[in-house]
């Protein structure tokens, strides 16, 4: 990829173009040379399936991974330091969390899996004379557990987004020798090796600026989400809550609403991000229903259930769905919500508030800031916005703010604030290129169909919510007539390849093979074919990107002619 460094990956809304190959070697971080990269290169279909199957030849080449899918190097180093402090207890592993509450939720999940095995916690913290702002971010909690519970531990890490971030772990390592530990187990009560007058330590610049950075993010989100309808109250900065990941935001609202009733229930409508159903199901609702087709028939079934006096607390949906790019009927969902008293939570990560105006129809908006809001592919983040026009506004604010703790690490916030300064301009550019690429693919004889908001059956619904100056988003997926053509197209497509979407550089993945590796038949029954290829369109010059797509298509044509 040439000498592309982090600065290039954080390029603004101008076109990106350079000579050489975009595709990175297997296992390389994306962006290249970025210590906090959130994607890893999976350059061939074979590599994707091998990694998901745990094949040693592929796994051993991975230099990093999406932070919720694995343990980042900085976090692993923190885990190693913790185990070394505690003299490496036999068959014991650990996970680090920014708060005791997150650690306790993890403990509860492990104990549900195996009530017999011992699980212990410890809190690392600076001595009491430390500057409070420094002490807040140097502290973290760990859970120590038997290695036999690793599979469950990884599921929790992936689905709930509560783990410590890589930058936070990196900072904690710089303070590690000063940290004491507290625990209900004597063997986990320790004193730091170093000591000096911590009250005299200078605060890092990023701690001083964190309040402004977070306010900039909130202001940008609130302004973008505000409805064009002048009769509606604008979204306020105080209505925006920031989280370390998008999944942490989803789990926060799900936990809060699950506790509101002894008979709480949740609906997931449409085909969501693969982790969302697991997250919602794991947050304590007494009843859970998924309507995975996101169709009119699904809404008819939901209405029939509601009329029969089955009640739900909340409905989760996405605009648009991933990877079908379908749009939910928010008008009808809003009508059902008003009639039967449930809350509507909508994830707008793919549609973006730049493109769609959903405030008139939803009570809560969730956004993964990791994706196009950041764009640079070097930081995680999530947000939850409470609609000030919602009839549930006071209840939601009370539920969420009374338990909210700001755990968004200041350096992550600073990175997001810098990356998102041209958010709207980048969305508009990606909209334009993605529409052109979707049309290019859709016109090709080897392609059976393209999923893009203009090309799927819900296109009229998307138009109802599209802002006057909004486009159709940066994401599309393509289904080839022949599975072998899909594999060849992916292998020959010269773009970044790996997990995540919304990066400033185009990035592709065989979606079902990655997100539904163990449930591909089930996913196919809901409109996600095994050989679907997802493409997130970035800021590259359209002529450059279209030529790369056309080169891959020419390889497909040649294979099909040769038989």
Swiss-Prot record:
Transferase recorded as keyword: yes
GO molecular function: cystathionine gamma-synthase activity; pyridoxal phosphate binding
Cofactor(s) it depends on: pyridoxal 5'-phosphate
Region (Disordered): 1-37
Annotated metabolic or biological route of this protein: Secondary metabolite biosynthesis
GO biological process: transsulfuration
Family to which the UniProt record says this protein belongs: Belongs to the trans-sulfuration enzymes family. MET7 subfamily.
Protein name as it appears in the record: Cystathionine gamma-synthase-like protein ankD
Organism, as annotated: Aspergillus thermomutatus (Neosartorya pseudofischeri)
Record gene name: ankD
């Amino acid at each position: 990829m040439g000498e592309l460094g982090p600065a290039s990956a954080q390029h603004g809304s101008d076109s990106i173009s350079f000579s050489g190959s975009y595709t990175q070697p297997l296992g390389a971080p994306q962006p290249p040379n970025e210590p906090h990269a959130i994607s890893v290169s999976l350059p061939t279909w074979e590599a994707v399936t091998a990694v998901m199957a745990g094949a040693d030849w592929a796994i051993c080449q991975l230099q990093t991974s999406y932070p919720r899918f694995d343990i980042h190097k900085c976090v692993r180093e923190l885990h190693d330091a913790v185990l070394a402090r505690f003299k490496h207890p036999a068959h014991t592993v650990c996970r680090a969390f920014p708060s005791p509450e997150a650690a306790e939720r993890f403990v509860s999940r492990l104990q549900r899996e195996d009530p017999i095995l011992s699980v212990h916690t410890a809190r690392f913290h600076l001595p009491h004379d430390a500057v409070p702002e420094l002490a807040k971010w140097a502290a973290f909690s760990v859970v120590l557990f038997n290695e036999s519970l690793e599979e469950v531990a990884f599921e929790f890490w992936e689905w709930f987004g509560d783990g410590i971030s890589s930058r936070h772990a990196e900072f904690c390592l710089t303070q590690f020798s000063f940290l004491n530990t507290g625990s209900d187990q004597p063997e986990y009560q320790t004193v730091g090796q170093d000591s000096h007058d911590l009250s005299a330590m200078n605060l890092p610049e990023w701690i001083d600026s964190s309040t402004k950075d977070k306010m900039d993010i909130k202001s940008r989100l609130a302004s973008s989400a505000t409805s064009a309808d002048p009769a509606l109250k604008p979204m306020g900065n105080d209505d925006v809550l920031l989280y370390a990941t998008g999944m942490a935001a989803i789990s926060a609202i799900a936990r809060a609403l699950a506790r509101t009733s002894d008979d709480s229930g949740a609906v997931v409508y449409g085909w969501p991000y693969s982790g969302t159903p697991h997250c919602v199901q794991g947050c304590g609702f007494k009843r859970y229903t998924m309507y995975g087709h996101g169709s009119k028939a699904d809404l008819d079934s939901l209405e029939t259930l509601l009329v029969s006096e089955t009640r739900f607390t909340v409905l989760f949906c996405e605009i648009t769905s991933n990877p079908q790019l379908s749009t939910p009927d928010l008008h009808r969902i809003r009508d059902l919500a008003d009639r039967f008293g449930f809350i509507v939570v909508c994830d707008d990560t793919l549609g973006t508030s730049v493109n769609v105006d959903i405030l008139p129809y939803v009570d809560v908006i969730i956004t993964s800031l990791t994706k196009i809001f950041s764009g640079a592919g070097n930081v995680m983040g999530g947000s939850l916005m409470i609609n000030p026009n919602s009839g549930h506004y006071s209840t939601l604010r009370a539920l969420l703010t009374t338990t909210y703790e700001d755990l968004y690490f200041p350096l992550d916030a600073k990175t997001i604030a810098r990356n998102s300064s041209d958010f709207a301009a980048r969305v508009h550019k990606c909209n334009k290129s993605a529409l052109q690429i979707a049309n290019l693919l859709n016109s090709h004889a080897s392609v059976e169909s393209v999923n893009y908001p203009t090309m799927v059956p819900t296109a009229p619904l998307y138009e109802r919510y599209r802002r006057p100056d909004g486009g159709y988003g940066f994401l599309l997926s393509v289904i080839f007539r022949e599975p072998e053509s899909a594999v060849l197209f992916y292998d020959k497509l010269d773009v970044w390849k790996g997990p995540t979407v919304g990066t400033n550089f185009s990035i592709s993945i065989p979606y079902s093979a990655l997100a539904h590796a163990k449930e591909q038949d089930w996913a196919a029954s809901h409109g996600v074919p095994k050989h679907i290829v997802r493409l997130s369109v970035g800021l590259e010059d359209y002529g450059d990107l279209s030529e790369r797509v056309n080169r891959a298509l020419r390889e497909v044509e040649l294979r099909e002619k040769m038989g």
